[in-house]
Every structure is written in C-alpha cells, then in structure tokens.
C-alpha cells in the first residue's frame, strides 16, 4: 500500500533517462566508479603504510637488563653526591 512498486520504479527510471540521456548517465556512472576505485586504493595504501610505520612510542625501547644497570648507576651517583 505505502511502498513503491516495480512499476513506479520503472516509470522513475524512464523519466531519469529521458531527462539526462544515456551518455550523461554512463559518464556519471564511470566517474562514480573511478572515484570509488581511487578511494579504495588510497585506503589500502594508508593501511599498508600505517602498519609498516606503527610504533608504540616515539622513543627507543630498552632491554630490561639495561634498565636495571642504568637504575643502579643512577643510585650510585645519587649516593656519591649526597
């Protein structure tokens, strides 16, 4: 009752073709398709770039052993200064 039937859709399609013509509709379709293709390509390039350059932080990570030796060296310096 309130929905659009197939006949109404066909009438709308015929009116659109008469207004714009088949060449213009084909051109719009190809432009839209190339835009979607370019968007997908850019998204896939961005994902590959971000995966390759992804870091947890901006500084270099240190070994746990190095952190312990650096901490003990700092404690020794603090004791010597005091």
From Swiss-Prot:
This is Sec-independent protein translocase protein TatA. HAMAP family: TatA_E. Belongs to the TatA/E family. The chain crosses the membrane at residues 1-21. The gene is tatA. Its main location: membrane. One of its GO terms (molecular function) is protein transmembrane transporter activity. It is found in: Cell inner membrane. One of its GO terms (biological process) is protein transport by the Tat complex. The Tat system comprises two distinct complexes: a TatABC complex, containing multiple copies of TatA, TatB and TatC subunits, and a separate TatA complex, containing only TatA subunits. Substrates initially bind to the TatABC complex, which probably triggers association of the separate TatA complex to form the active translocon. Keywords: Cell inner membrane, Cell membrane, Membrane, Protein transport, Translocation, Transmembrane, Transmembrane helix, Transport. Part of the twin-arginine translocation (Tat) system that transports large folded proteins containing a characteristic twin-arginine motif in their signal peptide across membranes. TatA could form the protein-conducting channel of the Tat system.
């Amino acid at each position: 009752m309130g929905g659009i039937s197939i006949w109404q859709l066909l009438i709308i399609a015929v009116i659109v073709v008469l207004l714009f013509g088949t060449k213009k509709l084909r051109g719009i379709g190809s432009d839209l398709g190339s835009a979607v293709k370019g968007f997908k390509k850019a998204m896939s390039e961005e994902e590959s770039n971000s995966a390759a350059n992804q870091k947890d932080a901006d500084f270099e990570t240190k070994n746990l052993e190095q952190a312990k030796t650096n901490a003990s060296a700092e404690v020794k310096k603090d004791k010597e200064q005091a």
